[in-house]
């Protein structure tokens, strides 16, 4: 894999140990340390991303994503139960998904367009980290996680891009 570094800078600002310092790279995992520190400083340890639910008079449910990185199947199951209590069992006339909290045209230098789960783009309404974890058995594709139902979209995406056997792909 390509790499680059600036390991040491002297008191005058001269780079002492340098390799490919001017080439752009996907940030290494250690970058997450600085990101986490900054998030704790700015947002605080009690900050939680929100997914908001609104029901209008015509019984259309609006779901507005707020960038929750841990919106996963287990959380959705709990939210569904809470929604039934809050809005009753009368059928909905529609559901509108709103992912407009983040701009849709975000481009991050170094991010590659691959099927690898670690390359999945984030969004304001990402579910299960914008990935599909499935199993291909012959012509059948099923969820690899008992708590995660598989949708027709997930099946078609995994059929087109997923590996034989068990695997995870980005959406």
Residue ranges of each PLM-predicted region?
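Conserved serine DD-peptidase/penicillin-binding transpeptidase domain
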Residues: 41-171
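Active/ligand-binding-proximal structured segments within catalytic/core domains
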Residues: 25-39
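Beta-lactamase-like hydrolase cores
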Residues: 1-27, 43-46, 82-89
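Generic, low-specificity signal for short hydrophobic/alpha-helical stretches with a mild N-terminal bias
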Residues: 3, 15-18, 35, 65, ...
């Amino acid at each position: 894999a390509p790499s680059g570094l600036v390991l040491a800078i002297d008191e005058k600002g001269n780079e002492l140990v340098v390799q490919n310092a001017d080439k752009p790279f996907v940030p290494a995992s250690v970058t997450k340390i600085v990101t986490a520190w900054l998030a704790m400083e700015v947002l605080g340890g009690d900050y939680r991303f929100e997914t908001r639910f609104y029901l209008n008079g015509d019984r259309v449910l609006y779901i507005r994503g707020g960038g929750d990185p841990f919106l996963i199947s287990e959380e959705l199951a709990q939210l569904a139960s809470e929604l039934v209590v809050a809005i009753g069992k009368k059928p909905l006339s529609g559901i509108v998904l709103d992912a407009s909290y983040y701009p849709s045209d975000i481009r991050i230098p170094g991010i590659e367009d691959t099927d690898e789960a670690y390359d999945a783009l984030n969004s304001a309404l990402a579910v299960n980290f914008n990935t599909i974890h499935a199993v291909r058995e012959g012509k059948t594709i099923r969820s690899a996680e008992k708590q995660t139902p598989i949708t027709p979209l997930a099946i078609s995406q995994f059929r087109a891009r997923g590996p034989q056997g068990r695997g995870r792909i980005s959406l």
